[in-house]
UniProtKB/Swiss-Prot annotation:
Residue ranges with Acidic residues bias: 451-462, 492-501
Subunit structure of this chain's protein: Interacts with components of the PAF1 complex (PAF1C) such as LEO1, CTR9 and CDC73. Interacts with NCOR1. Interacts with HDAC3.
Localization: Nucleus; Chromosome
Xref: CDD domains: SET_SETD5
UniProt name for this protein: Histone-lysine N-methyltransferase SETD5
Pathological condition linked to this protein in its record: Intellectual developmental disorder, autosomal dominant 23: A disorder characterized by significantly below average general intellectual functioning associated with impairments in adaptive behavior and manifested during the developmental period. MRD23 patients manifest moderate to severe intellectual disability with additional variable features of brachycephaly, a low hairline, depressed nasal bridge, prominent high nasal root, tubular nose, upslanting palpebral fissures, long and smooth philtrum, micrognathia, thin upper lip, and crowded teeth.
Ranges where the SET domain occurs: 269-390
Broad class of where this protein is predominantly found: nucleus
Protein role: Chromatin regulator required for brain development: acts as a regulator of RNA elongation rate, thereby regulating neural stem cell (NSC) proliferation and synaptic transmission. May act by mediating trimethylation of 'Lys-36' of histone H3 (H3K36me3), which is essential to allow on-time RNA elongation dynamics. Also monomethylates 'Lys-9' of histone H3 (H3K9me1) in vitro. The relevance of histone methyltransferase activity is however subject to discussion.
Residue numbers spanned by region Disordered: 156-202, 418-682, 792-820, 849-882, 934-965, 1036-1230, 1242-1389, 1407-1442
Positions of modified residues (Phosphoserine): 72, 829, 852, 1198
Basic residues bias (residue ranges): 165-189, 611-621, 1062-1076
Length: 1442
């Protein structure tokens, strides 16, 4: 390709353009004519693409043959030469299409074109100052060699022309040459063998390339000049005529070269001025053949002269340390370079040094520039000739090799290099640079080999090498070699050994390497873990073991294979005294560090460096779940790690433990048996490991254990710090899983679901725990549930419910998370977002049904809750709420609040003002009712009073509600509503899901989907967990909103203000659908819902009279919480249940239905899942829901539903029936509120979780929610049996699921019908929904809320709810189970909530049942349940206390 073109000749341009693609003269030969060649070159785009080096000068460079008359050997190397072709080209005629589709001619076929090309080259060569003899010596050979050279540098397609192999190499710079020059020793650089070698990006490839460049290059007798350089020279000559016609300089250069060094004999300089010496396996240096005086012309640096930008077109140089390229910029400021990688002379071996003894000077002869090396100082014989760095080494991303004495500590290059003292084991420049580009596998392989070799060498030579210089560990550096040429043989031997080892290593099975890499990754992780844990162990244990000491052995183990790890441990034992330094590096030091440490107290940084990348590459390669899990565990142990770090720092100097002991500690700390580890150490570390094992935050077991431990340690915290509010939005979002209750962090809801789903594991445990030191604020995982259960069983009783209610209430109002986490860390444990979503959706669905029940007039105020019914219907704004905000004001206000929280965030937002007004009005009416309610509250309070949980809220609410019930009710209602809304907002996505559930309440798919989630298994627990969490949140809500009246108060007054602002965004389509469904529910199930609501309100008031009277929310929350012991609540609840009966579904229906429509419209509008949610739940769910809604509207749910509902109603109608219904309704009501529902589901979840989960899994669309799942499951089952009432059935299923455990035990009779038939589901699920919706909300707001409900409906609900709370609730969800043992606890709230919900939702459900599937069941039960679902869905129920 180097075609010599006379200066000024335009043909240079032409030739360059022809060869612009980097085509070689060969390519020209390939085509019969130059034009063909140009065409071919135009087609060389392939090669051009390969060689990003478009502007390489070689296109116009005079062919070496022309310029230099390349020797025949070069010709042979060339693909053109028959020999080279024979070697590189197939024996058969290669004529044919190249890969690019271009015609390729073999040598025989190219005879004519070759002659032409040779003639052209000759003519061009004549124009060039280079000797003609060289050109004449090897025309053909030169053509191909030059072509090869060009191809290599230009990456032109000529390689394609010559041989198929050429096309193979795609290395931009050398691919063509590789293809052709493989046979030629000097051009092997681009030979196929080189192509087969690894890429330059890999260490092996780079080393091979350097070897080829070092040993196989074409001797340059003259320079090859690129067209650009020629143009620049021409311009320069024109501008400075003085230099023209001075051949003497050239003659001098040639004479010097001839006299000194330019013979093609071998790679060493044969003449006196210079001698090439091999200093390393692939490195040679230029030594002075004799003493050289100052300014002596040592040698001309020959090669391909081109502009620097041409060489750097490929951008390779600063990626790799090209050793044979000289950069020069002192010629008129022109940046040029001489590329001697494949074409050059011995000057190419000159190395750069920070203390050069020679410099490059340019001379111009015959119009051509010559770069010569002049001595700038006297150079003694055999001294290395070095020049200054001609490039900015600081820009090189690889280790730059400096020729200065290795002992030079002032070398800026060595200082710059990370491991200046160490040269890479392989050719120093290439090895480091290649690390980055090296493939992970190769890098890991290479590092493993290096480490193994080093480990072996260090182990074998620990005593000997410990005294040796670290450099010996690696192949002696170039400097070393330069200084000690005699070491070359040793180095070569070492290199050979290394190569063999590399081969052996490469032969290692992939499994072995993978295992080793995995082992290293785990060891590294374990080491880190040990670092954190060991300080604690040291502080805890008497043995003072330096983590660094132990880590060093561990590191060695990590880096060496299992057998090697032991050896490395022994080695590290030797090095341990000096190991303290390696503490930070231990992972990187690994086996190398240990070995080198044995050799050298301070391991070389390079060994550490190689080992460092390998762990990284392996970790990245083997980014297994286990590794991630370890990482998460590390994060979870972050706090401990910090302590450990401090301990490490303190004990860093304490490397007193024997290496074995340290190794054992490391391994044991890693939970990995360490062979030969000290039993004592192991035991110590084992204890620490056990301690650490319990700290894995991502492990459910760990979470539960930690949470329980924290709770056990800090169970008193809720009482002490009821308001522990965490304002950290991240913590709140992750820990509470997007509790919207955090007023200060409204964006929490935007927290990624995965954040919540992982229980905010992303927040370092140290961050999370400091925020949640009490342990109640721990991750919201099953451990929360477990804690909730245990706490519900122990702490609820231990901590006054009122206090807990207060805490929850305050926390919810201020920061839902803090008090919840404090009091009901279990219940408040943030639900996983999906769980919350499902719960919310389910609740929303319920809310959709109970919208009218939320508004049900108090016609069925019945027994003790005429006020409840009255508040339900007495709220002036409640009616409005029913219309627009009825849920907020409906007697099911709690449910509405829950609904609001669940789904109608937007709705509430929309209704906020009205709600506030309505709430005020409702509070007034509620206060009026409270006049009655105080009696209820008092009666309930007397029942609830025993429950401490009711204490603060209950007591405060009760007395104050009795006295200033209105204010308290308003305040409590507002707070409860806020809390409830916060919960709902927090679960807004969840609400959307529950909404979807509610929306799809009748949809069998919904039921199916929910069951599917339940099938998940986790879904049920998760839902239960969500329910618990919601309960915690809903406790506050429940306080005010738990009782139907209280709920209304919450909705009417405080709830609306808080919930409305946080509207849940819903797609327009979804909004319209929800609105339509709400309307449908109002129309079809409106009467039922209203009646149910009224009945629920009445029953709820009856059940939570004290709650409702004292305060819609505050008192109710207290009351509900007080009934944490469901029994107490239940005795009032019994009355409430009577009231529920009084509010027969038909009555409730009539009233609730009317109310339910507005509410349901609103609630369903917001509670109905978004289109996305619907899609999520299943496209058919909305249709089923609509059909179910229509059926509900028609009041013709499946006969089974109706009969079942009627059955259930009849059961309540019976002496026990009311109780059962009350319990069921209470639970159903509770279920309706997302929190209540969640909690109810939890209740159901523990004992019934299995069954209900299964049912819900099959029927519930929101299977993801364990809590909802149970209810949904039933609902779905009901729905499946009666698809026509699918909406109602889905709703009832949800209800059933919600209260399943509590409600089912409460209304076992009616539940039994539900079990088999849609009707049964309808009745029971509604009861469950009410319980789940209301209970979670009421119980979440306060365990008292649930008890409050239960208090009023104590007689009916007390037995069954308490029973279900304790038994079924417990069975339904272990969290609830735990709570159920603590009826007063928030967990038990579900039951009390269930009671109150039963009362309150009895009306709701009645309305819902009547209007939907529930009407068939029986006016009372059906309506109540149906109302519940509506409210639960997202009408007023969510905004209210649902």
């Amino acid at each position: 390709m180097s075609i010599a073109i006379p200066l000024g000749v335009t043909t240079s341009d032409t030739s360059y353009s022809d060869m612009a693609a980097g085509s070689d003269p060969e390519s020209v030969e390939a085509s019969p004519a130059v034009n063909e060649k140009s065409v071919y070159s135009t087609h060389n785009y392939g090669t051009t693409q390969r060689h990003g080096c478009r502007g390489l000068p070689y296109a116009t460079i005079i062919p070496r043959s022309d310029l230099n008359g390349l020797p025949s050997p070069v010709e042979e190397r060339c693909g053109d030469s028959p020999n080279s072709e024979g070697e590189t080209v197939p024996t058969w005629c290669p004529c044919g299409l190249s890969q690019d589709g271009f015609l390729l001619n073999c040598d025989k076929c190219r005879g004519m074109s070759r002659g032409k090309v040779i003639r052209l080259h000759r003519r061009k060569q004549d124009n060039i100052s280079g000797g003609d003899s060289s050109a004449t010596e090897s025309w053909d050979e030169e053509l191909s060699p030059s072509t090869v050279l060009y191809t290599a540098t230009q990456h032109t397609p000529t390689s394609i022309t010559l041989t198929v192999r050429r096309t193979k190499p795609k290395k931009r710079k050398k691919s063509p040459e590789k293809g052709r020059a493989a046979p030629k020793t000097k051009k092997i650089k681009n030979s196929p063998s080189e192509a087969q070698n690894l890429d330059e990006n890999t260490t092996e490839g780079w080393e091979n390339r350097i070897r080829l460049w070092t040993d196989q290059y074409e001797e340059a007798f003259t320079n090859q000049y690129s067209a650009d350089v020629q143009n620049a020279l021409e311009q320069h000559l024109h501008s400075s005529k003085e230099f023209v016609g001075k051949p003497t300089i050239l003659d001098t250069i040639n004479k010097t070269e001839l006299a000194c060094n330019n013979t093609v004999i071998g790679s060493q300089m044969q003449l006196q001025l210079g001698r090439v010496t091999r200093v390393q396996k692939h490195r040679k240096i230029l030594r002075a053949a004799r003493d050289l005086a100052l300014d002596t012309l040592i040698i001309e640096y020959r090669g391909k002269v081109m502009l620097r930008q041409q060489f750097e077109v490929n951008g390779h140089f600063f990626k790799k340390p090209y050793p044979f390229v000289l950069f020069y910029s002192k010629f008129n400021g022109v940046e040029m370079c001489v590329d001697a990688r494949t074409f050059g002379n011995d000057a190419r071996f000159i190395r750069r040094s920070c203390t050069p003894n020679a410099e490059v000077r340019h001379m111009i002869a015959d119009g051509m520039i010559h770069l010569c090396i002049y001595a700038v100082s006297a150079i003694t014989k055999d001294a290395e000739v070095t020049i200054a760095f001609d490039y900015e080494y600081s820009n090189c991303n690889y280790k730059v090799d400096c020729a200065c004495h290795k002992g030079n500590r002032n070398c800026p290059i060595q200082k710059r290099n990370p491991n200046a003292t160490e040269l890479p084991l392989l050719p120093p420049p290439p090895s480091l640079p290649t690390i980055g580009a090296e493939t992970r596998r190769r890098k890991a392989r290479r590092k493993e080999l290096e480490m193994e070799q080093q480990n072996e060498a260090s182990e074998e030579n620990n005593d000997q090498q410990s005294q040796e210089v670290p450099e010996k560990v690696t192949v002696s550096s170039d400097h070393e070699e330069v200084d000690n040429p005699e070491e070359k043989p040793e180095e070569e031997k070492e290199e050979v050994i290394d190569d063999q080892e590399n081969l052996a290593h490469s032969r290692r099975t992939r499994e072995d390497r993978k295992v080793e890499a995995i082992m290293h990754a785990f060891e590294n992780l374990e080491k880190r873990k040990k670092r954190r844990d060991q300080p604690l162990e040291q502080s805890n244990s008497d043995v003072e073991i330096t983590t660094t000491t132990s880590e060093t052995p561990v590191g060695e183990e990590t880096k060496t294979e299992a057998p090697e790890s032991e050896v490395s441990n022994s080695v590290s034992n030797v090095t341990i005294p000096s190991t303290p330094q390696s503490v930070g590096v231990n992972t990187r030091r690994s086996s190398q560090a240990g070995d080198i440490a044995a050799e050298k107290l301070v391991p070389k940084p390079p060994p550490a460096k190689p080992s460092r990348p390998r762990p990284k590459s392996r970790i990245s390669r083997y980014r297994t779940s286990s590794a991630q899990r370890l990482k998460r565990q590390k994060q979870a142990n972050a706090q401990q790690a910090e302590l450990s770090q401090a301990a490490l720092e303190e004990g860093g100097s304490n490397s007193l433990v024997t290496p074995t002991e340290a190794g054992s500690l490391d391994s044991s700390g890693e939970n990995r048996p360490l062979t030969g580890s000290d039993p004592t150490v192991v035991s110590i570390t084992g204890s620490h490991v056990n301690r650490a094992a319990s700290k894995y935050p991502k492990t459910k077991k760990y979470l539960v254990t930690e949470w329980l431990n924290d709770k056990a340690e800090k169970q008193e915290c809720p009482v002490e710090c009821p308001l522990r509010i965490t304002t950290d939005p991240t913590v709140l979002a992750t820990t509470l899983n997007m509790l919207p209750g955090l007023i200060h962090s409204p964006l929490i809801c935007t927290t990624p679901k995965h954040y919540i789903r992982f229980g905010s594991p992303f927040i370092p445990e140290r961050r999370r725990r400091p925020l949640l030191p009490d342990g109640t604020f721990s991750s919201c995982k099953k451990r929360w549930i477990k804690q909730a259960l245990e706490e519900g069983m122990t702490q609820t009783s231990s901590v006054p419910q009122e206090t807990r209610t207060q805490h929850l209430y305050q926390s919810n109002e201020n920061s839902s998370s803090s008090s919840i986490c404090k009091d009901n860390a279990d219940l408040l444990s943030p639900l996983k977002k999906w769980k919350s979503r499902y719960l919310m959706e389910q609740n929303v669905t319920k809310l959709l049904r109970p919208l009218s029940p939320v508004t049900p007039p108090p016609p069925n105020s019945g027994s003790k809750s005429p006020q409840l019914a009255t508040p339900g219907s007495s709220h002036p704004g409640e009616e409005e709420c029913r219309n627009g905000y009825s849920l907020m004001f409906s007697p099911v206000t709690s449910l509405t609040t829950a609904s609001r929280c669940n789904t109608p965030l937007q709705f509430e937002l929309c209704h906020r003002k009205d709600l506030d007004l309505a709430k005020v009005g409702y509070l007034d009416s509620n206060t009026n009712s409270c006049a009655d309610r105080p009696s209820l509250l008092n009666s309930g309070h007397s029942d609830l009073a025993p429950h401490p949980s009711l204490g603060p809220t209950s007591e405060t609410g009760f007395p104050s509600r009795s006295g200033d019930g209105h204010q308290t009710l308003v305040r409590n209602s507002d707070q409860a509503f806020r809390t409830e809304f916060n919960l709902m907002y927090a679960y807004s996505p969840l609400n959307a899901m529950p909404r979807a559930d509610g929306l799809y309440r009748g949809s069998p798919l919904v039921g199916d989907r929910k069951p599917l989630h339940l099938d998940g298994g986790y879904c049920s627990p998760a839902e239960g967990f969500s329910s618990r969490y919601e309960h915690g949140l809903m406790k506050d809500l429940s306080r005010g909103s738990l009782s139907p009246g209280g709920e209304r108060a919450c909705e009417g007054v405080p709830s609306a203000p808080q919930n409305p602002p946080q509207r849940k965004k819903v797609s327009l389509l979804e909004y319209r659908k929800r609105k339509q469904e709400a309307k449908e529910n109002s129309a079809g199930g409106g009467g039922d819902s209203a009646q149910s609501k009224s009945k629920s309100a009445g029953a709820g008031q009856g059940s939570s009279n004290s709650v409702s009277d004292t305060g819609a929310h505050g008192v109710q929350g207290s009351s509900a919480r007080t009934p944490s012991s469901p029994h107490k609540k239940f005795s009032p609840s019994h009355s409430s249940m009577s009231h529920l009966e009084a509010v027969s579904p038909s009555d409730s229906r009539g009233t609730s239905s009317s109310h339910c429509r507005p509410q349901e419209n609103i609630s369903s509008r917001w509670m109905v899942p978004t289109s996305v949610e619907r899609l999520r739940e299943g496209g058919s769910i909305p249709k089923v829901l609509r059909s179910s809604v229509r059926v509900a509207q028609k009041g013709e749910p499946s006969p089974t539903w109706e009969s079942n509902i009627t059955e259930k109603d009849s059961d309540p109608a019976d002496g026990e029936g009311p109780e059962t219904l009350s319990s069921a309704l209470s639970k159903g009501a509770t279920v309706y509120s997302p929190s209540r529902y969640s909690y109810q589901l939890l209740q159901c979840d523990s004992p019934r979780t299995e069954s209900q989960s299964l049912l819900q899994q099959s029927s519930s669309p929101f299977r993801g929610h364990p809590t909802q799942s149970p209810g949904y499951s039933y609902r779905t089952t009901a729905l499946r049996p009666g698809n026509p009432p699918s909406h109602g059935s889905s709703e009832s299923s949800l209800s059933s699921t919600s209260y399943s455990s509590p409600a089912h035990p409460v209304s076992t009779d009616s539940l039994a019908p539900f079990t088999g038939t849609p009707g049964y589901f309808s009745s029971q699920p509604h009861s469950g929904n009410s319980t789940g919706s209301n209970l979670p909300r009421r119980s979440c707001p306060s365990s008292a809320a649930s008890p409050t409900l239960q208090g009023p409906s104590d007689s009916p609900t007390s037995d069954s709810v308490s029973q279900s709370s304790t038994g079924t609730l417990s069975s339904t969800s272990f969290p609830q189970n735990s709570r159920s043992s603590l009826p007063s606890d928030l967990r038990t709230i579900s039951l009390p909530s269930a009671g109150q919900s039963a009362v309150y939702q009895a009306s709701r459900v009645s309305a819902v049942s009547n209007s939907q599937h529930y009407p068939h069941r029986g006016s009372g039960g059906v309506h109540q349940y149906r109302l519940q679902p509506l409210q639960g869905s997202g009408v007023k129920t969510q905004t209210g206390l649902s």
